Amino acid sequence: MDGSSPLLAAAGSDGDRSSSEGEYTLAGGPSAGDTEKREGESPMEAAGAGTVGFSISRLDTLSALRLNRTRPAADTELRYLHLLWKPGELLQAGRSTPGKITSSRVRRLARARRNMGPIGKDLHAVKRLREAANSNDIDTVRRLLEDDTDPCAADDKGRTALHFSSCNGNETIVQLLLSYGADPNQRDSLGNTPLHLAACTNHVPVITTLLRGGARVDALDRAGRTPLHLARSKLNILQEGDSRSLETLRGEVTQIIQMLREYLNIMGQSEEREKLEHISTQLQNTRTREQVDEVTDLLASFTSLSIQMQNMGDR
């Protein structure tokens, strides 16, 4: 016997009301020490506590509990069932309802309990992680990851924290997320991977980091573009512009070489990798803007040739 009365059983089974709508129970008879315990009672509890009481006899030799009704009455049961489903009539009758809980308050309390549960906390944490990644808040990202927040949790559009940080070009956050197990190949609802988003926004260092973290190059772009195509586009921009300083230009060309190095390693193209290393050495020895431009042109030609060879191999 679990200690529940027939009244409680009937109330719980009639329609199986959702817990979010609140659950009402009948308490025992009032006593001087029950004041603090009765603060959260429903109107039905407040009205019925003094009319129907329950007592439990001592355990017999079979260790069974016998529940004894002190004042049973069929019409009283029906009356309290009626009050259970229509608690508002207590107010209309002018009865005192200390500690009453309205249905809206019950729903709010139930919602608050759900939100403070493990699932609610997790949902809040992963949302904060995505927001922090999108706003480049690395301190919050690190703290949430240290608290075991899932880095692969996506929003309703399939976007993860890694998608946001890759699109923003934040290499530090991308590396941090990868170190905590973020999936570089996870797709959003449109089929985009973090690598694809980094490519679309021309964030070469992020692409390099994603490639090192295990990103699949064949999932870079649904249009079939690879880091080679991105490198060529980036180099074309560098060749057309002349506003960059020598160090800035050298740094951007170096980033492109690093990206291509990771890509060629994944593809297993050792011969192409050797040619790239030769170009990288030439870049390191440059001292003037003209020399950097020459290396840039050489790298652009290398990239175009590699794309042609790749296209021939795909046929």
From Swiss-Prot:
The keyword Oxidoreductase does not apply. Residues 1-49 are annotated as: Disordered. It comes from the Eukaryota. One of its GO terms (cellular component) is cytoplasm. PROSITE patterns: ANK_REP_REGION (PS50297), ANK_REPEAT (PS50088). It holds the Pfam family Ank_2. ANK repeats lie at residues 124-153, 157-186, 190-219, 223-255. SUPFAM superfamilies: Ankyrin repeat. Plays an important role in regulating intracellular signaling events associated with erythroid terminal differentiation. This is Ankyrin repeat domain-containing protein 54. Keywords: ANK repeat, Cytoplasm, Nucleus, Repeat. GO terms for biological process: regulation of intracellular signal transduction. InterPro entries: Ankyrin_rpt (IPR002110), Ankyrin_rpt-contain_sf (IPR036770). SMART domains: ANK. It is found in: Nucleus; Cytoplasm; Midbody.
